[in-house]
Amino acid sequence: MAKTSNTNPENRQPAKKTVRQLPMNWFKFLIYCQLILTALSELSNAYLYLTGRVYAQEPGGAAGFYAQFPSFRIINLMFGAAGIIMAAFAVYTRFQLAGFKKGAPSLLLKFNLTTVVVTMIYHILYAFVSATYGRMLTGREIMSYIALFGIGMAYYMVNKSYFGKREFMFNR
């Protein structure tokens, strides 16, 4: 009885391509938790800044604070409006990611950068207006602003690396 050999090219099957499954835990955290909580946080902050309740603990409340420092009202109204826009941006980004839409990862990166930029603009305006009233920022405040910027940029880099490896999945 002759042995059949699998070395015959006719008997060989093409090698199956193995597609490496990438873990999606960070993705799930983003779409089911982080972006939703970010939107809620932005709306909450927008409410506090638009109503002046952010200064509720000040003597005389918001009215007393704004009477003494009227320029802060304009900054807070701008920041409150930005909070509403950022909340909508977070929700939109979440649904684009969840739907695996083309360009959704780059949209998330734009959201990350926009968040950092809006926060830094607020703090720069706050520092500038404070200086016009003779109040200089403390070293602790400056360090906290630098830390916020650093954390925001680190978060951006993590997302860039994570979604750079998964960009091919977002093709709808």
Show the residue positions of the predicted features.
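Topology signature of small-to-medium multi-pass alpha-helical membrane proteins
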Residues: 2-172
